[in-house]
Each structure stands twice: as structure tokens, then as C-alpha cells.
């Protein structure tokens, strides 16, 4: 039988993100009959703190389910059945996409910068991964930088973590026009991130 994989996500309660979840990710998970665990969390006060909670949430879900989990942001849609997650060899601890920043935002193929994106990320349930995520939790409590930058730094420090690099089609981020970047074929996209945070990061837009 195929491995059981739990798809996880959260949203801030009493905020526009509840509607975002119910418009984007939740219907996608149901469409593809993917086992999922979605939780509402209390507002921690600002966008930085709410997004940094991702690390604690992933740890809680790993300990709760004791199975491989795939975290996907609330404003993502699953365009095609994400079969790759079942095909990744067991030896890999996490699976994540590294965005070619210059290609995404400057249409430049210089390949000078690659950023870990935590919008779509798979975690195996094992001791190495649990240790990594616990470090992620602790660092996000003291660092003021974006949680995915914290995770990138930790993975670079922990060479024993085996990382599977997801293709861009599993973490396709809309450009500033709200469109799929022209270097990606729309029909090949599996998971698309619609970037609702661009609007709702500013709380004046919550009304």
C-alpha cells in the first residue's frame, strides 16, 4: 500500500486567512481526496509572529500523526494530484523547492541566488527531522528574519539532513501580476501559490 501522507496547514482565526483557506487550499485537498489536518490558530499579533508559528505547527503535527507530513500554505491550490510525494525515496528527510530568485523576479538566468521556500515542504517522521524542526522552532523565537530563511540556514548547518529538491512545479509562486511566471508551463504546475499575504500582511486590509 502507498505510504500514508498527511497534508497540513493552518490559518489565523478571525482573520481574512480563514476565507483564503476555504477558497484555495481546503477545496484543493478535498478535490484530490488527500488526507489533511487543518487548524485555526489564535492571532499572535503580527504577520511575522503568525508565519513563524509554522515551525511549531509542523513539529506538533509530526508528533501528533507520527507520519510523513506535507505543509502547504493556505493560499495555495493543488492543480494536479501531487504524486511525486509518494515517489520520493525513503532516504530523504525533507523535500523542498529552492526558488531561482533572479529567474522568478528579474527574468534573469544568472543562477546567483536560490531561496528555500517553505510554502510547500515535506517532512519525514524520523529523529533527524524532529531534531531539525525543533531547532527551527527555537531559532524562530529569537530571530526576526523570515521563518523560511531561518530554515534554510539550519539545513545548511545540518549536513546530515538529506534534502530532496522539489521542482518549481510543486511550489509555483505567482508573479507580481498574479500570474504564473512565463518560464513555467501552466499545464505542468502541480501546486500554485497565489500570495494572499501580499494583501493581508497589512492589517488595514483585514477590514
Segments and roles (model prediction):
Residues 1-68, 127, 158-159, 194-200, ...:
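N-terminal anchoring/stem segment of glycosyltransferases
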Residues 12-13, 43-44, 76-77, 100-103, ...:
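Short, solvent-exposed loop/turn segments at secondary-structure junctions
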Residues 26, 58-59, 82-86, 148-155, ...:
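Short amphipathic alpha-helical segments and helix-helix/interface helices
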Residues 36-39, 69, 94, 163-165, ...:
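Conserved beta-strand scaffold positions in the cores of enzyme catalytic domains, especially
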Residues 47, 97, 111-116, 188-196:
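ER/Golgi luminal nucleotide-sugar-dependent glycosyltransferases, focusing on the catalytic module
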Residues 47-50, 105-109, 172-181:
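Short, solvent-exposed polar/charged micro-motifs at secondary-structure junctions
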Residues 52-106, 110-115, 120-127:
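GT-A fold catalytic core of metal-dependent nucleotide-sugar glycosyltransferases
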Residues 123-207:
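Catalytic core and acceptor-binding pocket of nucleotide-sugar-dependent glycosyltransferases
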Amino acid at each position: 500500500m502507498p505510504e500514508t501522507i498527511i497534508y497540513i496547514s493552518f490559518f489565523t482565526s478571525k482573520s481574512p486567512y480563514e476565507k483564503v483557506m476555504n477558497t484555495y487550499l481546503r477545496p484543493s485537498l478535498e478535490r484530490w481526496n488527500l488526507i489533511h489536518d487543518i487548524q485555526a490558530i489564535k492571532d499572535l499579533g503580527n504577520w511575522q509572529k503568525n508565519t513563524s508559528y509554522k515551525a511549531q505547527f509542523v513539529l506538533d503535527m509530526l508528533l501528533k500523526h507520527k507520519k510523513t507530513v506535507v505543509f502547504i500554505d493556505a493560499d495555495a491550490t493543488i492543480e494536479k494530484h501531487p504524486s511525486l510525494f509518494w515517489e520520493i525515496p525513503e532516504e530523504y528527510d525533507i523535500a523542498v523547492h529552492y526558488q531561482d530568485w533572479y529567474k522568478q523576479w528579474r527574468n534573469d538566468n544568472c543562477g546567483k541566488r536560490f531561496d528555500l521556500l517553505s510554502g510547500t515542504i515535506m517532512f519525514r517522521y524520523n529523529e533527524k527531522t524532529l531534531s531539525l524542526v525543533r531547532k527551527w522552532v527555537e531559532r524562530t523565537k529569537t530571530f526576526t528574519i523570515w521563518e523560511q530563511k531561518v530554515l534554510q540556514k539550519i539545513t545548511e548547518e545540518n549536513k546530515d539532513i538529506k534534502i530532496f529538491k522539489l521542482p518549481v512545479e510543486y511550489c509555483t509562486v505567482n508573479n507580481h501580476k498574479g500570474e504564473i511566471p512565463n518560464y513555467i508551463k501552466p499545464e505542468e504546475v502541480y501546486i500554485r501559490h497565489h500570495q494572499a499575504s501580499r494583501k493581508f500582511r497589512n492589517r488595514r486590509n483585514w477590514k
